[in-house]
Amino acid sequence: MKTYKDELIKSMNYLAEKPNTIFVGQQTAYAGNPMSTTILDVSKDKMIETPVFEEVQMGMSVGLGMTNMCVITFYPRWDFLICAANQLVNHLDKFKHMTGYDSHVIIRVGKGSDDPLDPGVQHKAD
């Protein structure tokens, strides 16, 4: 029986086969969270590892998406995505309306957990 994770791995590998796909975010090129285990088979040449700067990461993703790249941008916790709200709401969301073109961005967001380590209230505000 296939698991949800198996299907995520399958979909990430499928997207990685496309020449214009790039993976952006924290712990993409360097493993460190459960999301990074879904792209272990993806070439490091298709990854841009970022520090913790969520708004800039989303801005980069929007910009890359404008160049016809298919961007999969990783946010290890959903509450990190809130920090990128400006780029998401004022740019990515409005891009097609403003220009007539699509910006191809897929946002992957993780849900906080407390196992094996409790990350505290800032990182599991589920």
Per-range role (PLM):
Residues 1-126:
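Thiamine diphosphate
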